[in-house]
Amino acid sequence: MEGASGGIILKQFELPLNKKINGLSTGYGSIFRLILGLSVNTPYVLFDEPVLGLDAQHRDLFYKLLVQKYAEHPCTMVVSTHLIAEVADLIEHTVIIRKGRILQDAPTEELTAACWAVSGPAGVVDSWAAGRDVFTSSVLGGLKTVCIRGGGTEDLPAGLERRRVGLQEYFISLMEEEDQR
């Protein structure tokens, strides 16, 4: 990476240079592998659970360096992760795979733009949601939240609230929908 040689990145992550690779902790092993990934200039870079074992500060540093690398050397970066909320703002295209089957493969904005969470008193939510494309729902006390696909949330009756669904909530809702099949 321009402006950030491997040595500088090593110092930023405080990687111990006096240990063998197999003697590194889980976190520092992850740091070693992600430094390798950040240092190559290839058309494709694959990161499989790159922040495994990293503390919040090191995860944040990795995400910043990932964006910097992309800005300096645009390429396709595949990031496989369970920490969806942490990377959601970095992801342009999302592929959701479950048990070897692709469930979704689309631009991230396209996946979440048409999904809404609507919540309020259970009876009011049920009446309003009837006939809509509800793909998951949850109840907490007397409040109910449904996640719906498509528009049509402009006509909410009094007492209901809507908000956009983020990528992690979309993912969880999709998995719950799959579980019900």
Where are the language model's segments positioned?
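ABC-family P-loop ATPase nucleotide-binding domains
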Residues: 1-32
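ABC ATPase "signature
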Residues: 105-106
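Helix N-cap at the start of a conserved alpha-helix in ABC-type nucleotide-binding domains
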Residues: 56-58
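Short loop immediately C-terminal to the Walker-B catalytic DE motif
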Residues: 51-52
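C-terminal coupling/interaction segments
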Residues: 133-136, 140-181
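Conserved H-loop
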Residues: 74-83
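A short, surface-exposed alpha-helical micro-motif characterized by mixed small hydrophobic
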Residues: 87-89
